[in-house]
């Protein structure tokens, strides 16, 4: 083991030691996380949403302990901290300024989401990663039940196919498709999501330039996502067919 890997291992062990064992099925250094290790890896990793990886090192900043409790899924600790005056709308300054609800929605911790909402957490919480409400945080995540719950609360204020909110014209189904969120894409389609919209940005330097849900699935080699979208009428606007090439 080289020095870098040794240091990382020590950090992970230290991180895991900060909380109670919540999930004994995880590798030892991740047993303090409620989420399954495999689910966390699927959610965010070096290749997918690397700026939202939350399980490799402790939180930093003024509210670090609060965000560690949220990320670990330690609901009892979250309740205690709120009872002792913790600001529920505090921002995770060591990351992208997410709120607790933003993190919980992304992680897909349904119990945590329910509790934070019951305590009045703001559904319009933003973060610096181009998130403008908690529904988008949930769509970036991978728990369709959380998406459904938040959508039910925000339905009258959110247009599934609105291309005016994101500066590049991305829609929720594009975001979910690009991150291989199969169940969420199915739900969005059931709610009327247009599978053939294309981003509106004219800035060719942007990653999102000239993309649709299917072109994202093609670019990221997401075969199951491609099949799902095509079954629901998607055409690759770049090829004029259902083909990626």
Language model regions located:
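Ankyrin repeat domain, specifically the short helix-to-loop turn at the C-terminus of the second helix
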Residues: 79-88, 114-122, 149-159, 186-194, ...
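Ankyrin-repeat-protein effector appendages
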Residues: 20-62, 218-219, 223-245
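Ankyrin-repeat boundary/"N-cap" motif
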Residues: 57-68, 91-100, 126-135, 161-172, ...
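Alpha-helical segment of the N-proximal tetratricopeptide repeat
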Residues: 64-80
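Classical Sec-dependent N-terminal signal peptides that target proteins to the secretory pathway
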Residues: 1-21
């Amino acid at each position: 083991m080289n020095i870098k890997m040794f240091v990382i291992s020590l950090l992970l062990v230290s991180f895991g030691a900060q909380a109670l064992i919540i999930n004994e099925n995880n590798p030892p250094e991740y047993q303090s996380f409620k989420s399954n290790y495999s689910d966390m890896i699927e959610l965010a990793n070096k290749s997918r949403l690397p700026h939202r990886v939350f399980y490799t090192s402790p939180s930093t900043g003024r509210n670090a302990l609060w965000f560690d409790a949220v990320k670990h899924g330690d609901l009892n600790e979250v309740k205690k901290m709120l009872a002792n005056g913790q600001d529920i709308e505090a921002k995770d300054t060591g990351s992208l300024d997410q709120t607790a609800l933003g993190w919980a929605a992304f992680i897909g911790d349904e119990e945590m989401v329910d509790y934070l909402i019951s305590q009045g957490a703001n559904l319009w919480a933003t973060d610096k990663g181009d998130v403008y409400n908690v529904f988008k945080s949930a769509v970036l995540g991978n728990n369709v039940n959380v998406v459904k719950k938040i959508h039910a609360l925000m339905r009258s204020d959110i247009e599934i196919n609105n291309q005016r909110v994101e500066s590049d014209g991305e829609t929720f189904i594009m975001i979910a498709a690009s991150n291989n969120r199969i169940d969420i894409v199915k739900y969005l389609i059931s709610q009327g999501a247009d599978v053939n919209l294309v981003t509106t940005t004219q800035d060719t330097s942007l990653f999102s330039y000239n993309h649709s849900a299917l072109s994202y699935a093609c670019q990221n080699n997401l075969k199951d996502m491609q099949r799902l979208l095509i079954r629901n009428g998607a055409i690759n606007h770049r090829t004029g067919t259902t083909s990626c090439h």
